[in-house]
């Protein structure tokens, strides 16, 4: 299969020749996706502060410590904060990290496999996505209300991704965490979020998505009847994207961009 548009060709027609020009092409790809699909995220805050609200040192049958942490940081409209859970396995050395964007608060299931992750020697940070901003059309809720919205402003995928990066900001200050080995994870629209987060934030070595579909890992040019199309994603979740994205409804096979560009942007530099 020939993927369109060409991954290693700039918008002006020039070809990527080496690692240095790939860096330039990668930034061009991110700007295309910001402009056409996910919107532009604000710059990261200068600092992120964290407060441990509670701590259970005998979680997961005594194999881990569970901490409830609240982080806070400055935004365009003042201070914003949200909580997350941190599971730390018993270890004398720094451990790799999973940051999970989760639909269900504090419900351990196949989407929130805390004990399996701990038993394999990883730390797990769990963000309930509604604590960042609600999964609704309300653009004044939570983080979405802390920035003015314009044509190319972020949708909620960008906001949830921003929240995951701020959690990583804080966790990189913790000596228990191996900051060289961090992954961001999500399912469905949070799978889209995990991919967009990993593409923008090079500190995440891995981006792991499950069933991310249209607007995630699905290649639009190859879709057939019965696949999730842009129109389906916009019908159910218009607030997840920038205001430009709906203009591509019905044009999945004609996109001047596609999701292989997103996946390539996650590749190590």
Task: State the predicted function of each range.
Residues 186-196:
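Glycine-rich nucleophile elbow surrounding the catalytic serine of serine-hydrolase chemistry
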Residues 199-205:
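Conserved hydrolase catalytic core segment
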Residues 265-269:
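Short, proline-enriched alpha-helix->beta-strand connector loops that line the catalytic pocket
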Residues 78-82, 88-97:
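Proline/glycine-enriched tight loop/beta-turn segments at coil->beta junctions
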Residues 94, 98-176, 216-222:
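Cap/lid segment of the alpha/beta-hydrolase catalytic domain
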Residues 177-188:
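Alpha/beta-hydrolase fold nucleophile elbow
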Residues 1-81:
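N-terminal targeting or regulatory segments adjacent to alpha/beta-hydrolase or S9 domains
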Residues 206-262:
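Mobile cap/lid helix-loop segments that gate and shape the active-site cleft of serine hydrolases
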């Amino acid at each position: 299969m020939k993927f369109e548009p060409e991954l290693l060709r700039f918008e002006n027609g020039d070809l990527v020749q080496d690692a240095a020009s790939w860096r330039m092409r990668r930034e061009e790809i991110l700007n295309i996706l910001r402009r056409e699909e996910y919107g532009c995220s604000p710059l990261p805050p200068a600092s992120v502060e964290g407060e441990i609200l509670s701590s259970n040192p005998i979680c997961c049958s005594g194999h881990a410590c569970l901490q409830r942490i609240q982080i806070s940081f400055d935004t365009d409209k003042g201070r914003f904060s949200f909580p997350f859970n941190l599971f730390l396995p018993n270890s004398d050395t720094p451990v790799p990290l999973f940051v999970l964007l989760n639909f269900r608060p504090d419900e351990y299931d196949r989407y929130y496999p805390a004990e399996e992750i701990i038993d394999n020697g990883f730390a797990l940070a769990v963000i309930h996505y509604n604590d960042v901003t609600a999964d609704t059309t309300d653009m004044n809720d939570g983080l979405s209300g802390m920035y003015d919205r314009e044509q190319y402003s972020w949708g909620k995928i960008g906001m949830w991704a921003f929240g995951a990066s701020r959690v990583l900001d804080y966790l990189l200050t913790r000596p228990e965490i191996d900051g060289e080995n961090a992954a961001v994870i999500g399912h469905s629209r949070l799978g889209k979020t995990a991919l967009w987060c990993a593409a923008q934030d090079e500190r995440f070595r891995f981006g792991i998505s499950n069933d991310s579909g249209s607007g995630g890992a699905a290649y639009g040019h190859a879709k057939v009847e019965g696949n999730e199309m842009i129109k389906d994603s916009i019908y159910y979740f218009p607030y997840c994207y920038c205001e430009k994205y709906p203009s591509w409804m019905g044009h999945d096979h004609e996109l001047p961009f596609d999701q292989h560009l997103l996946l390539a942007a996650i590749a190590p530099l």
